[in-house]
């Protein structure tokens, strides 16, 4: 790594660490919305003249989808340094559900983007989105377009993750951090099963509002109030997501990439 590249990397990391609230709007970054050929909402962030590379940034389990404030800040920062960021909202993850259709759509977006710009497209994935990125990078239709993959917090096996969720439901949280995680897991599982669960209408509205702000704006006191009012007396069985084994396998990088003959 040359010295100038090292300095650019330092500047990029510093800008990411500042957060959106401490970063001034950048007039050189252009944002425009598009729909993929199959109709998935996508926002593209790019520098008005500096275009060094292109990547697709994949969100995790968040009902904000590609509009998660942290992901927007990441995309704007990357664009500031010349990396065009394509940010889709994947329907399954944005609904707190585990759906293999997200993999198909992500692969389609990568292929469509690469064909459009006639250049390779990298993948950057966060949390569950990181695991999806790894799986898609091993697919034959997308593999040739993806020169690199970067993930943050990806899992290896979805069944193990959900088993951990189930075990956590049986434990009494011992500190603020554990409470924060326990409440979040319950909200995600409940929201993902909203079509099949009887729950007060005002509770659904409060739950959605809380989930949208959970990781960046909602206070711990607000989270505990919601838990005490709506979640405390619910049977823990309600919170257990139950994807079919076939779905678990397809959404697990450990298994989903097992047949890939190329190095990822």
Question: Residues of each region from the PLM?
Answer:
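Alpha/beta-hydrolase-fold enzymes
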Residues: 135-236
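Residue-level detector of conserved catalytic or cofactor/ligand-binding positions
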Residues: 256-264
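N-terminal cap/lid segment of alpha/beta-hydrolase-fold proteins
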Residues: 3-53
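Structural motif
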Residues: 53-54, 122, 148
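Short, surface-exposed "cap/lid" segments of acyl-processing enzymes
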Residues: 48-81, 87-90
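Catalytic nucleophile-loop/oxyanion-hole region of alpha/beta-hydrolase
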Residues: 67-74, 88-122, 137-140
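Active-site-proximal cap/loop segments of hydrolase catalytic domains
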Residues: 159-165, 237, 241-244, 248, ...
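Gly/Ala-rich beta-loop-alpha elbow adjacent to hydrolase catalytic centers
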Residues: 125-133, 149
């Amino acid at each position: 790594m040359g010295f100038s590249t090292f300095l650019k990397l330092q500047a990029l990391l510093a800008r990411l660490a500042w957060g959106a609230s401490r970063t001034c709007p950048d007039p050189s970054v252009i944002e425009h919305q598009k729909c993929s050929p199959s109709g998935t909402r996508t926002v593209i962030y790019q520098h008005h003249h500096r275009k060094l590379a292109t990547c697709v940034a994949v969100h995790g389990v968040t009902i904000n989808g590609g509009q998660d404030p942290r992901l927007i800040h990441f995309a704007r920062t990357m664009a500031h340094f010349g990396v065009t960021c394509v940010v889709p909202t994947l329907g399954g993850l944005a609904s707190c559900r585990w759906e293999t259709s997200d993999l198909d759509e992500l692969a389609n977006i990568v292929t469509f983007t690469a064909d459009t710009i006639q250049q390779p497209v990298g993948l950057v994935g966060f949390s569950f989105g990181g695991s999806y990125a790894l799986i898609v990078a091993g697919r034959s239709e997308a593999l040739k377009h993806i020169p690199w993959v970067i993930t943050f917090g990806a899992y290896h096996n979805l069944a193990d993750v959900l088993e951990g969720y189930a075990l956590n439901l049986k434990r009494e949280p011992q500190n603020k951090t554990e409470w924060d995680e326990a409440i979040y897991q319950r909200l995600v599982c409940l929201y993902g099963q909203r079509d099949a669960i009887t729950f007060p209408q005002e509770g659904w509205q409060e739950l959605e509002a809380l989930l949208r702000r959970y990781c960046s704006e909602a206070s711990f006191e607000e989270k505990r109030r919601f838990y005490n009012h709506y979640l405390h007396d619910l049977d823990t069985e309600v919170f257990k997501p139950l994807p079919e084994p076939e779905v678990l396998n397809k959404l697990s990088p450990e298994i989903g990439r097992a047949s890939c003959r190329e190095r990822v």
